Amino acid sequence: SKDGLKVQGWLMKPANFDPSKKYPMVLWIHGGPWSMYSVNWNWAYQNFAANGYAVLWTNPRGSTGYGQDFVNGIQHSYPGKDYDDLMASVDAARDTLHRGLADALIL
């Protein structure tokens, strides 16, 4: 994140991924803030990946599952640090994308 807090996230490559090509990317944001992603199967991610998109999903501050301090990290500041976490995740993914995963101009 912007202030150095580590935030968990996942980046799914498109089907038939070719590292020499660039791909559009979708940032999938969960509802909440009292919610979280975990390791699971999601038809929407699979659908986007099957149609040539990279898919990024994360648990920004305010998400459950990481302790009460993490949940309270957005108290009196919504949106704020949660938004910063999402954008930092996009930046981190974009750094990966520059190595051939996706087109940084189509996010």
Locate each region found by the language model.
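Serine-hydrolase catalytic core recognition
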Residues: 1-107
